[in-house]
């Protein structure tokens, strides 16, 4: 696309895209661009999948390029984003049971009429603090976030790139 080399834009999620591509005939796949958030969202699931096992990816354009995240628990067999009569962006998705959801409103969905909290996990890239060859001691970790509802945050640290042969702190 013009001066953009797509391989480097999607390198972080190429394994996920490869899995989707290899199973494309067995999946419901839907996607949309959310203009107001500078995001591209793609959802995929097998026809027999439960809401909990449904997955997706979100790509966000930032000053540092594309950043990617994964989602679980949103079964979107149909997904759309558009502008209403006032020019405000609205986003909706529909599940396999025929329910239609206002995609970015609230803190729960109601698959098949049963309230389900939205679970979220944020994972940073592995950080070497500028020198991968020097051992470091982390004395404290400062977290800043603004939840829009009730939440129960937890913190999980992984050392040496998650190497299972290295003792890791408990979850």
For the regions a language model picked out, list residue spans one by one.
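Beta-sheet repeat architectures centered on beta-propellers
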Residues: 2-171
